[in-house]
From Swiss-Prot:
The keyword Cytoplasm applies. Its cofactor is Mg(2+). This is Fructose-1,6-bisphosphatase class 1. HAMAP family: FBPase_class1. The keyword Metal-binding applies. Keywords: Carbohydrate metabolism, Cytoplasm, Hydrolase, Magnesium, Metal-binding. Its EC number is 3.1.3.11. InterPro entries: FBPase_C_dom, FBPase_class-1, FBPase_N, FBPtase, Fructose_bisphosphatase_AS. One of its GO terms (biological process) is fructose metabolic process. It comes from Escherichia coli O157:H7. Pathway: Carbohydrate biosynthesis; gluconeogenesis. SUPFAM superfamilies: Carbohydrate phosphatase. One of its GO terms (molecular function) is fructose 1,6-bisphosphate 1-phosphatase activity.
Length: 332
């Protein structure tokens, strides 16, 4: 049995000039995930379920657990003195860690994705993304350090809190998964070099919003539902409503996750920096693809911290199909 800590140290040789800082950073995220796991499991007992009454910068009501997870992860990262600052879906602006100007990494995160599902005991997750800063080491970080395209990511991953808690991450050398053993307090390697199955057969989208979708997406949904034995259609529809949970299932079983633009969200709803980029990085490392319907997600240069984007991620052939439909059936 190999633990996450042992695995990370073992893989340090894959990085030239490795100093151990990235290893320590991933260890800090691991610690934050353990704390969140513990408190999610007793959330109904300690009054951290439900809405907090506050709104985040996007105008969304923050759940108590959103804020809790944000603070715990932030504290775990700051305590190691290896992160110069963070950007979070739950923070209006970047958070600069005083005294950590010497650090060369920044972290972007969605502390608790799908938190509205907590009250009904549905899987939720944590998403994280790691970049090397672009401003000089020794100075405070600025927004410039965070507004980098996804192809500059050093590492990315997620933690899914479900029937078991699992941490999945990549440093650009494959995707690896670790299951948390609460009796030992460690994450143990369960899958190495994960890949999407050759052919996907599941599509994940909130079909309740069908009438609001672009024409190309509507046509693609109909394509998924049509019978065609040569392409193993119809595909199966599965939608949990938690990006981490939907992505994780599709990674294991094969499929595509879709979150297109709508009239009320013309740029899409998912955040480029906190959700799209890390998941796109993982998808490509696992042999999949991620797109906004026209452009590779990892090539998009972000303009603002909380920028949104349409998002299609999963098996490469399925993402290519939806891109084709969007191109062939544009909105008037």
């Amino acid at each position: 049995m190999k633990t996450l800590g042992e695995f990370i140290v073992e893989k340090q040789h894959e990085f030239s000039h490795a100093t151990g800082e990235l290893t320590a950073l991933l260890s800090a995220i691991k610690l934050g995930a353990k704390i969140i796991h513990r408190d999610i499991n007793k959330a109904g007992l300690v009054d951290i379920l439900g809405a907090s009454g506050a709104e985040n910068v996007q105008g969304e009501v923050q759940q108590k657990l959103d804020l809790f997870a944000n603070e715990k992860l932030k504290a775990a990262l700051k305590a190691r003195d290896i992160v110069a600052g963070i950007a979070s879906e739950e923070e209006d602006e970047i958070v600069v860690f005083e005294g950590c100007e010497h650090a060369k990494y920044v972290v972007l995160m969605d502390p608790l994705d799908g938190s509205s599902n907590i009250d009904v005991n549905v899987s939720v997750g944590t998403i994280f993304s790691i970049y090397r800063r672009v401003t000089p080491v020794g100075t405070p970080v600025t927004e410039e350090d965070f507004l980098q395209p996804g192809n500059k990511q050093v590492a990315a991953g997620y933690v899914v809190y479900g029937s078991s808690t699992m941490l999945v991450y990549s440093t650009g050398c494959g995707v690896h998964a670790f299951t948390y053993d609460p009796s030992l307090g460690v994450f143990c390697l369960c899958q190495e070099r994960m890949r999407f199955p050759e052919k996907g057969k599941t599509y994940s989208i909130n079909e309740g919003n069908y009438i609001k979708f672009p024409n190309g997406v509507k046509k693609y949904i109909k394509f998924c539902q049509e019978e065609d034995k040569s392409t193993n259609r119809p595909y199966t529809s599965r939608y949990i409503g938690s990006l981490v949970a939907d992505f994780h299932r599709n990674l294991l079983k094969g499929g595509i996750y879709l979150y297109p633009s709508t009239a009320s969200h013309p740029d899409g709803k998912l955040r480029l920096l906190y959700e799209c980029n890390p998941m796109a990085f993982l998808a490509e490392q696992a042999g999949g693809k991620a797109s906004d319907g026209k452009e590779r997600i990892l090539d998009i240069i972000p303009e603002t911290l909380h920028q949104r984007r349409s998002f299609f991620v999963g098996n490469d052939h399925m993402v290519e199909d939806v891109e084709r439909f969007i191109c062939e059936f544009p909105d008037a």
